[in-house]
Amino acid sequence: MANTVIINGDNRKFTLSPELKLYALIDAGFVKTVKGNFNYEHPLYNDSPYNAPTKLKMTINKDLNHLTMVITDRNGLQKVNIFKNKQLAPTVELLNYILKDLEERNIIVAVKD
């Protein structure tokens, strides 16, 4: 069973899908690292992806059983809570769209309490 993750400030929980396939990761934009893990970075932007203030970073280990997911600043160094600022509502909407797409591709699933 894969671990459960919560994005900083969100109340939803996610885990890896039991039907996760390697080709689905590659199709979704995950990049294989030198160590064999799979990284995914997506800028969360309103106008231009080149000046996005935040980005979604995900990592899945090479055994496809451990997930990390975090929203960071543009440099990728600081965790950011996009849910407590009302001006970032479009960013939250974009995040929801990305997570829904990853669920439809059977990469992640929402965990029900």
Identify the role of each PLM range.
Residues 4, 14-16, 44, 53-59, ...:
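Terminus-proximal functional modules
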Residues 1-28, 110-113:
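Terminal, regulation- and interaction-focused segments at domain boundaries
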